[in-house]
Amino acid sequence: MKLFLSILLLFAGYASFSQTYISIAPSLTNTAGTLADKSNLSLEVGRQWDVFSMGFDIGKTTLSPVGAKDTSTYLEIRPNLNIFQEGKFTNTFTAGIGYIFGANESLLTEVTYGIEYAYTDRLHFNVDFGNYYYSGKLSSSNVTFFGVSAALYFGSFKSGSIITRETK
């Protein structure tokens, strides 16, 4: 019974002091090839707690056709930290880890820095840049990327004290 109550309280706290978001993020890498070869696209769904967020990202490492076996689709977990905020602008840091399905270099790690603009409480735009690192059994590689994203938050979240008291 104690375990059940602990888990219930954990989930209640998780839901009470956070907000859900969805983000779409096109980007370009510095790889050789056509514009489609260099283009990436990802969709992220996650939760934000004050300055920390955790998202699950599904995407494509290239928008070019890859042949009979798709080796460009990936799934990634992306923790994000809002480092500094001034007005509607925020400096962000993201470190992610994921898996590229069917690829020889299937381990994906990511380091990203961004500048986010809060257009409204629910709609944010981000310009980001960083590196993707790919690793496999016999080889590894990395690419630099530059991208933009738009995030929609499903509710506004105000950080502050759990208990508030009105003064007269």
Q: Which ranges hold each PLM region?
A:
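Gram-negative (and chloroplast) outer-membrane scaffold detector with strong preference
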Residues: 46-125, 152
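Short glycine/proline- and aromatic-enriched beta-strand/turn motifs that initiate or cap beta-hairpins
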Residues: 16-62, 147-158, 168
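Predominantly the C-terminal beta-signal and adjacent terminal strand-loop region
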Residues: 36, 60-62, 66-67, 111-168
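Short hydrophobic/aromatic beta-strand or adjacent loop that forms the aromatic wall/cage
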Residues: 40-42, 72-76, 143-147
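Positively charged n-region of N-terminal signal peptides that target proteins for export
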Residues: 1-4, 19
